[in-house]
């Protein structure tokens, strides 16, 4: 009787954990699949040489606007890495619970948006004029953030910690944090760059265009809609 119970328990563990681990590794491979598509859209080798000469220009290296643009690219990548890391924490927390429905929801949510997010990151970096080698490095860091954090979260939690996280709904909190970072990066960094100074490639004297009232309203509305929809659905 004990042997049968132990066998059943051990056979259920892989079933519960498998979707989350499969999602974590699939996220990494999905993002890597974007790389060949982006390489096909990048300039030729001759244009790459021109880009390298452009980045080696001492006038541009000493230009504060060029430095600001470089910092913007790094900040955008860093924000999306934090977003992906939060996805990984949510994934690891979901895998540590016995709620199969939560695991499935997190799995589907991450699979649906990870590849478009990676493609958007690469498109933004290409639009900003970053060379292909640096784009690959940015993409690699972004693609590894979710699976690495999911495994660290799952393997680093003790049994008592998993129970405590389950009580405070750590998966939901991590997903909320992930969504917030994504909204912040998209609204504060990507949209102003693409919709404002990105078309002319000539920043104004103030160092770039700030957010308009409409953009701020859209950001606030995007934050409030999930809160409004969640009213009356507390479990």
Swiss-Prot record:
<dbReference type="GO" id="GO:2000654">
    <property type="term" value="P:regulation of cellular response to testosterone stimulus"/>
</dbReference>
<keyword id="KW-0813">Transport</keyword>
<feature type="transmembrane region" description="Helical">
    <location>
        <begin position="75"/>
        <end position="95"/>
    </location>
</feature>
<dbReference type="GO" id="GO:0005802">
    <property type="term" value="C:trans-Golgi network"/>
</dbReference>
<feature type="transmembrane region" description="Helical">
    <location>
        <begin position="172"/>
        <end position="192"/>
    </location>
</feature>
<dbReference type="GO" id="GO:0004930">
    <property type="term" value="F:G protein-coupled receptor activity"/>
</dbReference>
<keyword id="KW-0864">Zinc transport</keyword>
<comment type="similarity">
    <text>Belongs to the ZIP transporter (TC 2.A.5) family.</text>
</comment>
<keyword id="KW-0496">Mitochondrion</keyword>
<keyword id="KW-1133">Transmembrane helix</keyword>
<keyword id="KW-0333">Golgi apparatus</keyword>
<keyword id="KW-0963">Cytoplasm</keyword>
<dbReference type="GO" id="GO:0070830">
    <property type="term" value="P:bicellular tight junction assembly"/>
</dbReference>
<comment type="function">
    <text>Transports zinc ions across cell and organelle membranes into the cytoplasm and regulates intracellular zinc homeostasis. Participates in the zinc ions efflux out of the secretory compartments. Regulates intracellular zinc level, resulting in the enhancement of AKT1 and MAPK3/MAPK1 (Erk1/2) phosphorylation in response to the BCR activation. Also functions as a membrane androgen receptor that mediates, through a G protein, the non-classical androgen signaling pathway, characterized by the activation of MAPK3/MAPK1 (Erk1/2) and transcription factors CREB1 or ATF1.</text>
</comment>
<feature type="glycosylation site" description="N-linked (GlcNAc...) asparagine">
    <location>
        <position position="2"/>
    </location>
</feature>
<dbReference type="GO" id="GO:0005385">
    <property type="term" value="F:zinc ion transmembrane transporter activity"/>
</dbReference>
<feature type="transmembrane region" description="Helical">
    <location>
        <begin position="214"/>
        <end position="234"/>
    </location>
</feature>
<dbReference type="GO" id="GO:0005497">
    <property type="term" value="F:androgen binding"/>
</dbReference>
<dbReference type="InterPro" id="IPR045891">
    <property type="entry name" value="ZIP9"/>
</dbReference>
<keyword id="KW-0862">Zinc</keyword>
<dbReference type="GO" id="GO:0005886">
    <property type="term" value="C:plasma membrane"/>
</dbReference>
<dbReference type="GO" id="GO:0071577">
    <property type="term" value="P:zinc ion transmembrane transport"/>
</dbReference>
<dbReference type="GO" id="GO:0022883">
    <property type="term" value="F:zinc efflux transmembrane transporter activity"/>
</dbReference>
<dbReference type="Pfam" id="PF02535">
    <property type="entry name" value="Zip"/>
</dbReference>
<dbReference type="GO" id="GO:0006882">
    <property type="term" value="P:intracellular zinc ion homeostasis"/>
</dbReference>
<protein>
    <recommendedName>
        <fullName>Zinc transporter ZIP9</fullName>
    </recommendedName>
</protein>
<dbReference type="GO" id="GO:0005634">
    <property type="term" value="C:nucleus"/>
</dbReference>
<keyword id="KW-0325">Glycoprotein</keyword>
<feature type="transmembrane region" description="Helical">
    <location>
        <begin position="11"/>
        <end position="31"/>
    </location>
</feature>
<keyword id="KW-1003">Cell membrane</keyword>
<keyword id="KW-0406">Ion transport</keyword>
<keyword id="KW-0539">Nucleus</keyword>
<dbReference type="GO" id="GO:0005739">
    <property type="term" value="C:mitochondrion"/>
</dbReference>
<keyword id="KW-0472">Membrane</keyword>
<dbReference type="GO" id="GO:1905562">
    <property type="term" value="P:regulation of vascular endothelial cell proliferation"/>
</dbReference>
<keyword id="KW-0812">Transmembrane</keyword>
<dbReference type="InterPro" id="IPR003689">
    <property type="entry name" value="ZIP"/>
</dbReference>
<feature type="glycosylation site" description="N-linked (GlcNAc...) asparagine">
    <location>
        <position position="169"/>
    </location>
</feature>
<feature type="transmembrane region" description="Helical">
    <location>
        <begin position="104"/>
        <end position="124"/>
    </location>
</feature>
<dbReference type="GO" id="GO:0048471">
    <property type="term" value="C:perinuclear region of cytoplasm"/>
</dbReference>
<feature type="transmembrane region" description="Helical">
    <location>
        <begin position="138"/>
        <end position="158"/>
    </location>
</feature>
<dbReference type="GO" id="GO:0031966">
    <property type="term" value="C:mitochondrial membrane"/>
</dbReference>
